[in-house]
């Protein structure tokens, strides 16, 4: 599975069954939630110095007596490891300091003592620096922790607002489309209130996920734009529910969510028909 860091500094590939999980700020954590075999973490740092990456490797080799120079794929690294005990179980943490140009990476892989670190080395081999100013094609990747947080925040605001204004429950089912529409049509929100309209779009998107099997949240990276969207069974059917609502409101066009739901459902059914043929 491909991962592109927020801001587009780097990309990497991680195993299909692995997922990204919330971690400390500026650190990205990946592991298999169903069959845990270790935690892989990566942090990236950028500096104005063009040889910053090499400086970091040299510094690690100088200051850490247990570090040694190794090659992982095309990457020069300073590698070290340590073994520790936690709650009666022994673990080993492997560390790599990697650098190139003005970027430095710190990677770690913590797993039970005696475990195989090759999966972490494969991830490091896949690591690529995305060049500043280079035009990359639009990519769709599994939804990142960043966008999950944005979706949750937007949905929480929209659902709370709808329940407060209508004094009705909101369970993210098809029947709730009318409630979103009622609040959108109430005149309480002005076209320039982008956050509100996009949040209503996210709430609509949540209904699409709940009502259409195979519809899932993804992250779209398109140049400098990075946003949550919906993709149907890995097909070309891609929906940006936040933009769907806000762009219509901004252009003073009618936004009928029931009609949009029916349209998207037809398109999803057409995708399934194509897959069967």
Give the residues covered by each predicted segment.
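Secretory pathway targeting signatures of secreted, lumenal, and periplasmic proteins
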Residues: 2-55, 59
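A recognition module on extended beta-rich or small alphabeta surfaces enriched in W/G with H and D/E
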Residues: 229-277
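Short secondary-structure junctions
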Residues: 16-23, 61-73, 214-217
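Short, charged/polar micro-motifs that form catalytic or ligand-binding hotspots
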Residues: 113, 170, 190-198, 235, ...
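Surface-exposed amphipathic alpha-helical segments
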Residues: 16-18, 105-138
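Signature of long, low-cysteine stretches enriched in small and polar/charged residues
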Residues: 56-104, 110-113
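N-terminal low-complexity, intrinsically disordered segments
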Residues: 137-195
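Amphipathic protein-protein interaction modules
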Residues: 92, 195-248
């Amino acid at each position: 599975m491909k991962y592109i860091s927020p801001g587009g500094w780097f990309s990497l590939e991680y195993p299909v069954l692995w997922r990204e999980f919330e971690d400390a700020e500026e650190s990205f954590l990946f592991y298999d939630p169903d069959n845990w075999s270790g935690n892989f973490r990566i942090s990236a740092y950028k500096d104005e110095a063009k040889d910053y990456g090499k400086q970091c490797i040299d510094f690690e080799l100088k200051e850490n007596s247990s570090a040694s120079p190794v090659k992982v794929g095309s990457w020069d690294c300073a590698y070290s490891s340590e073994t520790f005990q936690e709650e009666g179980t022994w673990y080993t943490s492997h560390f790599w300091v990697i650098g190139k140009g003005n970027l430095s990476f710190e990677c770690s892989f913590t797993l039970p003592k005696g475990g195989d670190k090759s999966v972490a080395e494969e991830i490091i081999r896949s690591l690529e620096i995305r060049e500043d100013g280079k035009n990359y094609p639009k990519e769709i990747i599994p939804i990142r922790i960043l966008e999950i947080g944005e979706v949750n925040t937007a949905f929480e605001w929209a659902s709370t607002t709808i329940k407060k204004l209508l004094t009705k429950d909101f369970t993210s089912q098809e029947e709730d489309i009318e409630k979103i529409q009622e609040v959108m049509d109430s005149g309480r929100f002005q076209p320039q209130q982008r956050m509100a309209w996009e949040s209503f779009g996210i709430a609509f998107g949540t209904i699409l996920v709940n009502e259409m099997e195979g519809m899932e949240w993804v992250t779209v990276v398109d140049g400098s734009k990075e946003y949550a969207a919906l993709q149907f069974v890995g097909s070309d059917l891609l929906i940006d529910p936040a933009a769907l609502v806000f762009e219509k409101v901004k252009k003073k066009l009618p936004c009928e969510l029931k009609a949009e739901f029916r349209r998207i459902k037809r398109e999803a059914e057409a995708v399934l028909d194509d897959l069967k043929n």
